[in-house]
């Protein structure tokens, strides 16, 4: 079993790196504001038709464009969900959503979280899924990538005030990266058996002779961008464990690759744009080491079996409860780590049914900010915050002003870095405390004791870090939970983007200093270890008390 797990992880990472390298080169061209071959004419026509100016923006203008687009998208999606019974492509005549569920869902998809307090096949029309959720899957992913584009430019430009043009970046990212790759993935899913139609739900007679209603819909087109954009919201309630979304072992492997593809490519692009590919490889090494260790822990925990069943004398050599039986415990464990290391949240196994340690690792990966590959754009700019913190700590140890890529890291950058890093832990801990202090929060818990607290902690961690997966034992479709999680999702997304853009605005105006004998190399194994240690230290100091009350207490009981 250990050899199979190692082979699975190694194969996954090898294929991922092979696919991400050329995509990274394409992204580097976009960051450097070089149009891709054959796209100049199309861009000129589109920019003219849309009235888009290619004039560069400072960080405040860039940020305003990103925020304005997302707030407008939130309002449109909110009212679309409220009035979906008036809109077309609703063959099941599904009613509009309640205000709190519509708000939660709109915030969820605009922030790239895709937390779902509803069952897709019984709640949303085809129009809402297509024109509402799928559109936001593209826009939220493009917004995250645009932010990291601006931050990378801040490190590589000198004595400037501009970071590019947000509208140009958003259009290029959507047209030349997300749309074509998602189209290829969608066509592959259709070929493998995923649904893509507009038929009404089909009544069929099962083998036992009973009647069953099978949901239909344009699934493959949403499934592709759901994974590629690290969105994660399923067309159906079972998410990627539903055979209409994820029909074969091959589509399952492609889904995992799609989740990590752009985050990995962005690391390659960063090294290329910075003029030192070792910088990108350093980030990939740090992410990969944490990823492999976490995957190994989850696989080991699930292969050991369920201790509670063993105590009752039942055969539980492997914990298959809640796992995707088509793919097995190892693939289910790998998928769980992939989806929580990134900000995806799609699932093929019920994380609530994992063992205490097996469920703690995905929760912890979210709590550290999903910086292990992470979401499209958000993962890399989250990791860059830890890079700045690691550089600052190293500067304190050697008594020099910290610098990264020749840019000196001053008090302003460190204050903004600390603010950005503290946003999500504050939301998680305060949100979990509020839920446990109120009847409305506690009443949603299915299980008592440590596991019940783990359900609450996981939900708030997922929302604040824009993941969207859940310990499904929590009944979250209530006004209290819909509003609490909507607040966590919104602040967790834009409360980090705002200081990141402010950091970019500060760095882009600085000159790059040549490296000296006292400069800390940021591309070698020493800095990789320092960066990993910084991530682990911040995660340990922040969340060990909360984890001790939940999964650790459950494991020891």
Curated annotation (Swiss-Prot):
GO terms for cellular component: plasma membrane. It comes from the Bacteria. The chain crosses the membrane at residues 5-25, 63-83, 132-152, 170-190, 253-273, 283-303, 329-349, 356-376, 379-399, 416-436, 484-504, 526-546. Part of the high-affinity ATP-driven potassium transport (or Kdp) system, which catalyzes the hydrolysis of ATP coupled with the electrogenic transport of potassium into the cytoplasm. This subunit binds the periplasmic potassium ions and delivers the ions to the membrane domain of KdpB through an intramembrane tunnel. It comes from Escherichia coli O6:H1 (strain CFT073 / ATCC 700928 / UPEC). Keywords: Cell inner membrane, Cell membrane, Ion transport, Membrane, Potassium, Potassium transport, Transmembrane, Transmembrane helix, Transport. It is found in: Cell inner membrane. GO terms for molecular function: P-type potassium transmembrane transporter activity; potassium ion binding. Disulfide bonds: none annotated. This is Potassium-transporting ATPase potassium-binding subunit. The lineage of its organism: Bacteria, Pseudomonadati, Pseudomonadota, Gammaproteobacteria, Enterobacterales. The system is composed of three essential subunits: KdpA, KdpB and KdpC.
């Amino acid at each position: 079993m250990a050899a199979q797990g190692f082979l699975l992880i190694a194969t996954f990472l090898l294929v991922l790196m092979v696919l991400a390298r050329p995509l990274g080169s394409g992204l580097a061209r976009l960051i450097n504001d070089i149009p891709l071959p054959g796209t100049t004419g199309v861009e000129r026509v589109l920019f003219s038709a849309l009235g888009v100016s290619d004039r560069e923006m400072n960080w405040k203008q860039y940020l305003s464009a990103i925020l304005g687009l997302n707030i407008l998208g939130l309002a449109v999606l909110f009212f679309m969900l409220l009035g979906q019974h008036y809109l077309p492509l609703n063959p099941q005549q599904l009613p509009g959503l309640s205000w709190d569920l519509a708000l939660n869902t709109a915030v969820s998809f605009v922030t790239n979280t895709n937390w779902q307090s509803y069952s897709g096949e019984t709640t949303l029309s085809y129009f809402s899924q297509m024109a509402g959720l799928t559109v936001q899957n593209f826009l939220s992913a493009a917004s995250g990538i645009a932010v990291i584009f601006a931050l990378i430019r801040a490190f590589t430009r000198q004595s400037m005030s501009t970071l590019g043009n947000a509208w140009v970046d958003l259009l290029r990212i959507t047209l030349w990266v997300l749309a074509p790759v998602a189209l290829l993935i969608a066509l592959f899913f259709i070929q493998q058996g995923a649904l893509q139609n507009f038929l009404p739900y089909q009544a069929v007679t099962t083998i036992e002779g009973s009647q069953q209603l099978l949901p239909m819909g344009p699934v493959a087109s949403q499934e592709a961008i759901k994974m590629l954009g690290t969105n994660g919201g399923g067309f159906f309630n079972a998410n990627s464990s539903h055979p209409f979304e994820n029909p074969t072992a091959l589509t399952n492997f492609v889904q995992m690759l799609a989740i990590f593809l752009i985050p990995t490519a962005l690391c390659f692009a960063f090294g290329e744009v910075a003029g030192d590919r070792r910088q990108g490889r350093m980030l990939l090494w740090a992410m990969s080491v944490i990823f492999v260790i976490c995957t190994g822990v989850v696989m080991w925990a699930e292969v050991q079996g369920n201790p509670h069943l063993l105590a009752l004398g039942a055969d539980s050599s492997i914990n298959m409860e809640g796992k995707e039986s088509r793919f097995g415990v190892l693939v289910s464990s790998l998928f769980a780590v992939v989806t929580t290391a990134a900000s995806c949240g799609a699932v093929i196994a019920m994380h609530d049914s994992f063992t205490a340690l097996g469920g703690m690792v995905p929760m912890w990966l979210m709590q550290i900010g999903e910086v292990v590959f992470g979401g499209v754009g958000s993962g890399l700019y989250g990791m860059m915050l830890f890079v700045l913190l690691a550089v600052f700590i190293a500067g304190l140890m050697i008594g020099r002003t910290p610098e990264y890529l020749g840019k000196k890291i001053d008090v302003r950058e460190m204050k903004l870095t600390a603010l950005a890093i503290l946003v999500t832990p504050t939301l998680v801990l305060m949100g979990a405390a509020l839920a446990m202090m109120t009847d409305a929060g506690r009443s949603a818990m299915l299980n008592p004791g440590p596991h019940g607290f783990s359900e609450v902690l996981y939900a708030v961690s997922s929302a604040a870090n824009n993941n969207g997966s859940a310990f499904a034992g929590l009944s979250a479709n209530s006004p209290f939970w819909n509003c609490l999680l909507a607040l966590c999702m919104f602040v967790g997304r834009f409360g980090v983007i705002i200081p990141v853009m402010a950091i970019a605005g500060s760095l882009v105006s600085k000159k790059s200093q040549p490296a000296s004998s006292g400069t800390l190399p940021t591309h070698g194994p020493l800095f990789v270890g320092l960066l990993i240690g910084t991530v682990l230290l911040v995660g340990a100091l922040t969340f060990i008390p909360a984890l001790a009350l939940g999964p650790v207490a459950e494991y020891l009981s």
